[in-house]
Amino acid sequence: MYPDGVCRVTDSYYTKTVQFQDINYQLNQNEDKTAIFDGWCDFLNYFDSSIRFQLSFINLSATRDTYARRIAIPLQGDCFDKLRTEYTGMLQSQLARGNNGLIKTKYLTFGVEADSLKAAKPRLERIETDILNNFRRLGVQAEVLNGMERLRLLHGMLHMDEPQPFRFSWDWLAPSGLSVKDFIAPSAFEFKTGSSFGVGSKTGCVSFLQILAPELNDRMLADFLDMESSLIVSMHVRSVDQVKAIKTIKRKITDLQKMTIEEQKKAVRSGYDMDIIPSDLATYGTEAKKLLQELQSRNERMFLLTFLVVNVADNRQRLGNNVFQAGSIAQKYNCQLTRLDFQQEEGFMSALPLGYNQIEIQRGLTTSSVAIFVPFTTQELFQDGKEALYCGLNALSNNLIMVDRKLLKNPNGLILGTPGSGKSFSAKREIANVFLVTNDDIIICDPEAEYGPLVEHLHGQVVKISPTSTDYLNPMDLNLNYSDDENPLSLKSDFILSLCELIVGGKDGLMPVEKTIIDRCVRSVYREYLSDPRPEKMPILEDLYNELRRQDEKEAQYIATALEIYVTGSLNVFNHRSNVNIENRVVSFDIKELGKQLKKIGMLVVQDAVWNRVTVNREQRKSTRYYIDEMHLLLKEEQTAAYTVEIWKRFRKWGGVPTGITQNVKDLLSSREVENIFENSDYVYMLNQASGDRQILAKQLNISPHQLSYVTQSAEGEGLLFYGSVILPFVDRFPKDTELYKIITTKLSDLSEQTGEEAKDAITE
């Protein structure tokens, strides 16, 4: 093994290994499956007879501790450690439901014959580049393993019984006089019985697949890989030279024709119809001609395939069960899994990803027959970074979904779902998760007063804004870092135009003249503050009103009159300087009691206050998570929608992670401009959808009918997750016996149960 990943397997045979990731295949509709299948056929046809290659699918068990460490939330020595411990326990119980106990990896090893390493390297590098490009065309992520990574992989396969770390350095070879084999070899090998083998304390068995079926199914390989036990599937494939393959088949056809003539002569001599020939002979002749036609005119090549399955277990009884299960899968598809008696050592060595086949049991197959063993099933999303958040279980594999939105190009997100689909619960669960594992600030716009109990439990601050409240937010607040521009007034003017549109605009919005007047007045009222930026000089809505009154245009008087009720009238809740301290890490703006007239204005003012907070946090290199419930209310008026879209775009650059929560998809897609919210959101958590919304979303997000079924009449907490280019169906069954569930549930039945339990406790006391 060389540091660059080239391995000299024999004196004249050199190989390299590429690791590739999974993509969604089983979830796709038939057209997409066909496209992937055709792409995989083209991939296989790339390999000519001079290149041998091996596909390795390695499912090895990891200890629960390995995964537990990856999902554990570190304790921080504060009053929330009890909640962190509970949340970690919840993640571990969810982990136990899936088969995350297996680490599943996929590799392609390719090799060439060459006289020397120097001669082999250029060829291997060219093939490597072509393979990576072919994977890219399929939408598959792939990377080449270097020497250290290949040795670590081999070490893991040879030490399945002991999770000891791989220790090795290239610098150790020369002084020690050892070879790389000494660093990866297990404590013991045993190949005594002929029908099984031992490696360390594990016992295993190598079998080969006899392909007897006239037609194969693309589920076969997936079913092998879905087994919940340690397993290695190895496919050694070698292309046959096209000219030789055609000559061989033509020769077979000639031989069959000779045999047919002999049979016909025999029939004439015996006095029966010469057309009556053995059925096998007729079948073979037809199949041979069909095969010749495929090779000559259908872009098919001939391959020789050796299909090996290695089962590994702790003891012979468990091994027998695993082998029986694998054999049942083969029989289901009219094939047979046969043990390699007295070839266990050769079989196990052939299963290692070295690209070297010592088993001479081969089956001739065309390109499409080899390609039916599609190496893709379903994509997994399990990111183990310290800020990865729980999103449920993969509905296809039952594995944990853990993602870090900050790793996306655009972390902005949407939570979409009909009432009762689990929309609010999902948002609250994410908020709690963010609070426990990150240091990000969390701000919530709460139009229905749903988030108060959670915020209070997290020692956050609920700012109640209503006509009767004494909590005030000044819509004219301006942070000097409000915009990237030298003049922060540009973006602030946009906000005040949006505010005035909600107040004045009516059906047609603000007229150009009105916009000009408002912009002029805004610049005037901020002049004093910008020259001496002290809090007491911050303008309020009344200053804008007075400035409008001083203008000569009749439009200015019209705008001022429209503003009057919000300045001196009964709706003057926003005509005060801010008196709330919103520096708490978790802040919720409760605007439920603002009423229909003021609610949209309240949401817009909250959005502006959040933007001020984002600009402050940016200076401190701190992220701000913003959750906007009932977001569709901000998207109905043109100017307000335009401002919201602008803020949505700016959030990413300023360290903001906004999440819109809504049931009204139609409003989200009401105009081309608002569609930008979708285009600037790489994270969509989609729960059950109404039929009209499903069709809109299918078109907007290019969702297949099969994928759409996961958001059609789906139960609470079930749906589709869009994370960048990945689409996964998920199921979130959050344990009801946890303290966190009781805090975040909005179901009346759960709340009444809690009340009943509290009453019982009181009686008992």
Placement of each model-derived feature along the sequence:
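Conserved lysine of the Walker
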Residues: 423
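A short helix-turn-beta junction within AAA+ P-loop NTPase domains corresponding to the substrate/partner-engaging
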Residues: 459-463, 673-686
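Hydrophobic anchor at the beta1->P-loop junction of P-loop NTPases
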Residues: 415
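Conserved P-loop NTPase
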Residues: 701-756
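Hydrophobic positions on the alpha1 helix immediately C-terminal to the Walker A/P-loop
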Residues: 426
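Post-Walker A helix-loop "phosphate-sensing" segment adjacent to the P-loop in P-loop NTPases
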Residues: 433-443
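P-loop NTPase motor domains
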Residues: 23, 30-49, 56, 60, ...
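Extended, folded cores of ATP/NTP-driven motor/assembly subunits in large transport
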Residues: 1-378
